[in-house]
Structure formats: structure tokens, C-alpha cells
Design a protein with these regions (language model features):
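Arg/Lys-rich, positively charged N-terminal/basic patches that mediate binding to nucleic acids
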Residues: 1-46, 129
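Generic recognition of long tandem-repeat/solenoid scaffolds
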Residues: 18-21, 76-80
Length: 129
């Protein structure tokens, strides 16, 4: 059974909180970020800019940020996008939880991994109740 925690994303400060999911002491989003080739660093900076806009409750183009679903149990899936990068997460009552990231070329596989982590995390919350 995995142990989950949330860690605040210090670079994002706004009306909404932005956290990243930590699984068994490792953060999938940090691992994604650290594995990026240098040519994609500017795209990731752009995604951080859109995260800040969302945290500040500003309007963001649908092509850069959108929800995937209507939400179950008050939790909705979302995606931040750039030309080559994707960042996946879910909503929480006072903000967003970033779960993982990926590239456009592998997005099918990475969406499956995102949903697997999301479901495990949500199941862990239900066990705590």
C-alpha cells in the first residue's frame, strides 16, 4: 500500500493552492521535471505561468488548460498543455493537485499512469475516513 502526501508548489502563490502529489517519498511531477531535456524547459516555464494564472483565478485559454470531466465526488481531472508537454492533475477544495507530467508523444500511456495514481490517492483518502 502506497503512502501519499501533498507538497506545496512554492513557485505558485495565489488564491488557489497548488500542491504536488508525493508517493512513497517520491514526487512523480518532480521526476518528470528533472528528466526533461533542456529544449523543453521554456515550455515548462510557460506551463508554470498558466498555473499561476489559474491560482490567481484568471482566465486561461482552453488550449492551455482544460478539465477532462464533470467530476466525481467533487474531484475533477485537468490538463495543462504546451506544444510538447502535458501536466495532469485533479482539483481539491481549495485548489489543485499536480500528479504527473508527460510529453505529447506518450500522452496515452502517461494519462493511464496519471489516472492510476489519482485512483490510488483517492482510495487512500477513503480509507482514512
Amino acid at each position: 500500500m502506497s503512502i501519499f502526501a501533498l507538497q506545496k508548489i512554492e513557485a505558485i502563490k495565489g488564491k488557489q493552492e497548488f500542491d504536488k502529489l508525493v508517493v512513497d517519498g517520491k514526487c512523480p511531477f518532480d521526476e518528470f521535471e528533472n528528466s526533461l531535456e533542456s529544449q523543453y524547459k521554456s515550455e515548462l516555464a510557460g506551463i508554470y505561468h498558466y498555473m499561476q494564472d489559474v491560482a490567481d483565478l484568471k482566465s486561461v485559454p482552453y488550449a492551455k488548460f482544460h478539465f477532462y470531466d464533470e467530476g466525481k465526488n467533487g474531484v475533477r481531472e485537468f490538463e495543462f498543455k504546451s506544444k510538447h508537454l502535458r501536466v495532469y492533475g485533479i482539483t481539491k477544495s481549495n485548489g489543485k493537485i499536480i500528479i504527473t507530467g508527460g510529453t505529447k508523444t506518450k500522452q496515452g500511456t502517461e494519462q493511464n499512469e496519471f489516472r492510476k495514481l489519482k485512483n490510488l490517492y483517492l482510495a487512500s483518502l477513503m480509507r482514512k475516513k
